[in-house]
A protein has these predicted regions:
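A preference for well-ordered globular domain cores
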Residues: 1-189
Length: 189
């Protein structure tokens, strides 16, 4: 099926994931010279798709007693960014709709919380994905590459690099919150 073009390399790796065939079978099918590049290409695509799926799935936020879910498709991200711009420009509230909810008025503080939760998830996942991708690209066998799973603990130095980058992002989010609180206090005075 692979030779006839009916099955691509991703399909071969899916068959491995379902235990229908082994990596040894993939190597035999694509040839030893092509095995690493084929498996790596498919794995990089797989982890990219997994990263995107986690992001699009979105975030849950608790406002008082209410648990609210926000998907983070590209359109949703754009809407949330626009909401945050309203707050940055001095808006104190704005209507928006959580997934499965009705449109309601969110306060500036709630909009900031939505934005920060969304950006934190996006930054965490994309940073993790990029570090995992770098790690995968250092591997030298199809078997090693095939064993990689999105969500696994990163080995060093990738874990430290990710944590350092996320610490910078967290500091910036805290700076945003601080500036917003300062602006709100100034406006109330």
């Amino acid at each position: 099926m692979y030779e006839e073009g009916l099955l691509d390399t991703t399909g071969l790796l899916n068959a491995v994931a379902k235990d229908w065939i082994t990596i040894t079978d993939v190597i035999e099918i694509v040839g030893e010279d092509n095995a690493l590049s084929v498996v790596m290409s498919a794995k990089l695509s797989e982890i990219s798709n997994a990263c995107n799926a986690v992001i699009v799935n979105g975030v849950d936020i608790k406002f008082g007693e209410e648990n609210v879910h926000f998907n983070l498709s590209i359109e949703d991200q754009s809407n949330i960014n626009n909401l945050f711009c309203v707050v940055e420009l001095g808006g104190t509230e704005f209507p928006y709709q959580a997934d499965g909810g009705v449109c309601r008025i969110y306060t500036a503080a709630e909009i900031a919380a939505i934005y920060i939760a969304a950006q934190t998830l996006i930054t965490t996942q994309t940073t993790y994905h990029n570090e995992l991708k770098q790690y995968v690209q250092t591997l030298t066998s199809a078997e090693e590459v095939s064993a990689i799973q999105y969500g696994m603990t990163l080995p060093e130095p990738y874990l430290t690099e990710m944590n350092e980058k996320l610490a910078v992002a967290q500091q910036q989010m805290q700076a945003i919150v601080g500036r917003m609180q300062q602006a709100a206090a100034t406006n109330q005075a």
